[in-house]
Amino acid sequence: VMNVKVAPNIRVGFIVGAGDQVPTALEQLGAKLDFIEPNDLAWGDLSRYDVIMTGVRAYERRKDLRAYNRRLLDFAERGGTVIVQYNKMEFNQAQYGPYPARVGAGRVTDENAPVKVLVPDHPVFTFPNTIGESTWRGWVQERGLYFLGEKDPKYVDLLQMEDPFPDNPGVKLGSLVEARTGKGRWLYVGLGLWRQVPAEVEGAYQLLANLISLPKAPK
């Protein structure tokens, strides 16, 4: 049994991309989950959600998301939390984040690569689960890929990590990035949580729980 806490009564709207098991994990965590279909995205009431999350590569797969992305930015400005899982270069065809940003080729392929938390008092690392060394143990395949690259200074990097071998040198940023916008927040997650969830990696569930709990985090 995993030791993972989640804030109560979190409503998540999920925009399916290429397909991942994160929605199942969110339901296991106790979130109230709806799948956001094209009509919902165009004119449905998004204010009933605490969090809107996009599946992996959703900007490539979902024409409606590209067309109605402004609705996600409005949702964040009004106090919502938007969580965007990794995208490929399709994300760079327009400005889909609240400020200019581009997905780059940044990745960390060693699943045990050391991770440094850059903003330790950020609620994503403290509420309701405390993120520490053990969070990063037992990962599979990689830490993440298609990190956010060039970006407006209003985006804040929350993590840095570094592959321990010479063919991918240097500290990598862009794996977990937040921008505050209006009353809410917009986050980009290049971390491969979608890859860890089927492998039942407890640390990934803790991070996922903290991400969706952000709207209820103590101010």
Model regions: which residues?
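Aromatic-Pro/Gly-enriched surface loop or interdomain linker
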Residues: 1-55, 86-90, 109-111, 195-197, ...
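Alpha-helical scaffolding within the catalytic cores
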Residues: 38-42, 67-70, 170-176
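Solvent-exposed, acidic/flexible segments
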Residues: 15, 19, 65, 69, ...
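Extracellular/periplasmic catalytic domains that process cell-envelope and extracellular macromolecules
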Residues: 5-7, 45-47, 76-77, 170, ...
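Catalytic beta-strand/loop cores that center a nucleophilic Ser/Cys/Thr
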Residues: 102-201
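A glycine-rich, often tryptophan-bearing local segment used as a flexible ligand/cofactor-contacting loop or short
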Residues: 57-140
